[in-house]
Amino acid sequence: MKKIFALLLMVVMSVTLLAGCGSDPVYDDLENFLNVEMKEVNADYTKITEEVGKWETLEDDTAIKKSIDDTLLPLVNGSLEKLKDITPETEEVKAIKDKYVKVMETYKTGFEALSEGCETQDEATINEGSQKLEEAVELLDEYNKALEELAKEHGSEVEY
């Protein structure tokens, strides 16, 4: 009877231990980050790219400044506020989030400089803003690569 009880106890303990081994906190945190917490931020980014896409049809710097001041900067600032409320549980996902915050901060700096340049007609300020926007795109590429690598390391994938 003792042998049967000991065997049964070992089986129960083994099942319990194996069930605990299947959990990956980074995977869970990343899935939550991408599919829940970043949902609104990603929607804002889509609106940002759509608004910038309209610039080709705008006739003058005043219209571009209005686009920046009335639409783009509020979207970027809103994204930065939403990002403040996101608190990943793992260091790996925190690092990914920090990369995205840097992207948005760089967009903000670029849009602010472009807005000022449109108002003052200062070519140097416009160039500075354009360079910052190019830097933001490069940072976004780095964010996406880091995100894809982390997802791959933890058995997930990123869909765009």
Placement of each model-derived feature along the sequence:
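Alpha-helical segments in soluble extracytoplasmic regions
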Residues: 29-104, 109-111, 116-158
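Bacterial signal peptide processing site
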Residues: 22-24
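C-terminal motif of bacterial Sec signal peptides marking the signal peptidase cleavage site
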Residues: 16-20
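Internal alpha-helical transmembrane segments of multi-pass membrane proteins, especially GPCRs
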Residues: 6-10
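Positively charged n-region of N-terminal signal peptides that target proteins for export
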Residues: 1-4
